[in-house]
């Protein structure tokens, strides 16, 4: 990661030790993560990798909250940069993020959006491995005293008042190397199980799914590439 970011001198890089959910005891997880609300919201238990990921992102958000910065770029350590980040200067990042409106700006793909533009407004998105977030958004997410969902539950955060923007075409992808594939955060665990949700939540979850299908049908979905060891292998 250090070598990857060294070419971008405009970034002031700070590394944060991730929280490994696999090393946490059941008591530690119960103390820091709301398992009951998680089941009602997602209809399933999160695995330890997902819990550790959610707690790690909150740790990064607290760093931003306690700093004097207006916003920060959060990158996970297994990403591949597929477009030159020096191009960010042409997107008006300061204008987008230097605001009291809770805002995130995704550099990743896998998002649904309304109107085609260089910077789009998202309906929903998947992934939390590369995004700008401003102080207001960090405060908004941290206002959930005890987390109960995944780090990239952007739709829930949007319902709380978060504005989700994204750069199109996207700039950063998750690197599907063998270390990631064998990690505790695996694709088969993503999503939710309506059968085990609260009834209200289960019913309401159908509407966003329909909207996303329609947006994808009309070409308003930014599909991501597949990257293996830093090389694009398909889409």
Where are these regions (language model features)?
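An acidic/histidine-cluster motif and surrounding catalytic segment
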Residues: 1-75, 79-235
